[in-house]
Amino acid sequence: MSPMLQIAAEEMENPLIPPIPELVIGLIAFVIVFGFLAKKLLPNINKVLEERREAIEGGIEKAEAAQTEAQSVLEQYKAQLAEARHEAARLRQEAQEQGATLIAEMRAEGQRQREEIIAAGHAQIQADRKAAASALRQDVGKLATELAGKLVGESLEDHARQSRVIDRFLDELDDKATTAEATR
């Protein structure tokens, strides 16, 4: 064979197209493998894929439920916090009002006690003044009687008369003192 014929013969066989018997055997093998995969492996793969899809969807649903629950808990927390703040403000207001009331009561009580102490002091001063005036009258009367007795040179022992004279004299002095104070 000449080299030209050989090239022509080689050109007749296309290396890209397989021979027919190999093509038939390959096709039969492919159908068998595909059938086996479709019967045995494909359902398992589909089952796993379905489970994954359900798990993902379930996870999403769980996440959405958890997010909804978290949002609900957050809203409850915010409501409780607002209520606690309101309650704290109310308690603070009550404490301020009670404090103001207590201060007013204590001031009134202090004022009342002060008035009582002042009144008791005035009463005590008045009583002490009367006692001092009485003691002074007696002492002045006694001294006046002794002085008069020394001046006259005799004893003035008539006590009733002596008391009347001294009381009248001291009353006149009191009246003059009262009149002098009133004119000021």
From Swiss-Prot:
Pfam families to which the protein is assigned, alphabetical: ATP-synt_B
Superkingdom, taxonomy of origin: Bacteria
Transmembrane segments: 16-36
InterPro entries named in the record: ATP_synth_B-like_membr_sf, ATP_synth_b/b'su_bac/chlpt, ATP_synth_F0_bsu_bac, ATP_synthase_B_chain
Keywords carried by this UniProt record: ATP synthesis, Cell membrane, CF(0), Hydrogen ion transport, Ion transport, Membrane, Transmembrane, Transmembrane helix, Transport
Keyword Nucleotide-binding annotated: no
Keyword Membrane: yes
Membrane topology: Single-pass membrane protein
Family per similarity comment: Belongs to the ATPase B chain family.
SUBUNIT field: F-type ATPases have 2 components, F(1) - the catalytic core - and F(0) - the membrane proton channel. F(1) has five subunits: alpha(3), beta(3), gamma(1), delta(1), epsilon(1). F(0) has three main subunits: a(1), b(2) and c(10-14). The alpha and beta chains form an alternating ring which encloses part of the gamma chain. F(1) is attached to F(0) by a central stalk formed by the gamma and epsilon chains, while a peripheral stalk is formed by the delta and b chains.
Function in brief: F(1)F(0) ATP synthase produces ATP from ADP in the presence of a proton or sodium gradient. F-type ATPases consist of two structural domains, F(1) containing the extramembraneous catalytic core and F(0) containing the membrane proton channel, linked together by a central stalk and a peripheral stalk. During catalysis, ATP synthesis in the catalytic domain of F(1) is coupled via a rotary mechanism of the central stalk subunits to proton translocation.
Protein name per UniProt: ATP synthase subunit b
Protein source organism: Streptomyces coelicolor (strain ATCC BAA-471 / A3(2) / M145)
